[in-house]
Amino acid sequence: MVEADRPGKLFIGGLNTETNEKALEAVFCKYGRVVEVLLMKDRETNKSRGFAFVTFESPADAKDAARELNGKALDGKPIKVEQATKPSFSTPSRRGPPTSPRSRGPPRGLRGSRGGGSSRGQMPLKRGPPPRSGGPPPKRSAPSGPLRSSEMGGRAPLSRERDGYGAPPRRDPMPSRRDVYMSPRDDGYSGKDRYDGYSGRDYGSSRDSRDYGPPPRDYSYRDYGHSSSRDDYGSRGYSDRDGYGGRDSRDYSDHQSGGSYRDSYEGYGNSRSAPPARGPPPSYGGSSRYDDYSSTRDGYGGRDSYSSSRNDIYSSGRDRVGRQERGLPPSMDRGYPPPRDSYSSSSRGGPRGGGRGGSRSDRGGGRSRY
């Protein structure tokens, strides 16, 4: 890649450090008109570095001078005279440093777009409908709920995606979410966790509650529970939230029967949901799903919205969500536990589970009332 410098420019090397421009010009001007004599000097000491460039007006004169003077002695030292070439280092030095930053730059951009952009970008698309339910949570709910449930294959990509996007963010955003929205609820969970190992695991993480949010609108808690559990907890989440998801399926069938769903929900929602319900949680839109059945202190209004959301996943689930999105506390749920009959009637399996529901509502209501 050595290219000749401008025609008529000669490189003179091996100079005596005492030789100066004037001496060079005196020697070379014999062969033709010299346009420029450039003696390379050390910047600090200003002494000759032993080479120079002499430019002739006519390239032919330069060739003659190079032919005649190459190897001749000047000031006691043989000099090397040849057609000057553009210094090879200058090309890389000019081109190189910029390219390395540039090359570094795009990767950063790509990394950014790959990590943040694509995964985050896709998420917004998926996030589309759910955001109504309350801001941040949908990020998770949307992919996890509909997508996860609809396509089992999606699990791996989503989890990977979430890892790509979520692994660090889990540490950052989620804690913040947990702090912002869930701190009371977290305490509620962890505390309840201890005496309610079952629901504690399910609701234990803000992510769970977050995951529960939009689904009322998203299609079904079942889809949602499984997916979120898979996302958040991997294998344990599966079993845990299988605890939840299983409860979901249990919720579906048993809720209709009015039996064990009430059981699981009570043992589950009330003991745990009651304390958390008191705090800020309702204002947390995403948690509305959690509020839907959990924050309701009685756990029955919650199940109301839950059962009806079962019946109409969209209508009452969304109503409840809307109410809590607007920040109105579930007045009925929170203010005073509903009467026993509201509980039994609330569940679809009213007649069958009525007696059991009533007594349980007593027990659950008392517990939720503290």
Swiss-Prot record:
Residues 127-140 have a biased composition (Pro residues). SUPFAM superfamilies: RNA-binding domain, RBD. Its main location: nucleus. Residues 69-370 are annotated as: Disordered. The keyword RNA-binding applies. GO terms for cellular component: catalytic step 2 spliceosome; euchromatin; extracellular exosome; nucleus; spliceosomal complex; supraspliceosomal complex. It is found in: Nucleus. Residues 8-86 form the RRM domain. It comes from the Eukaryota. This is RNA-binding motif protein, X chromosome.
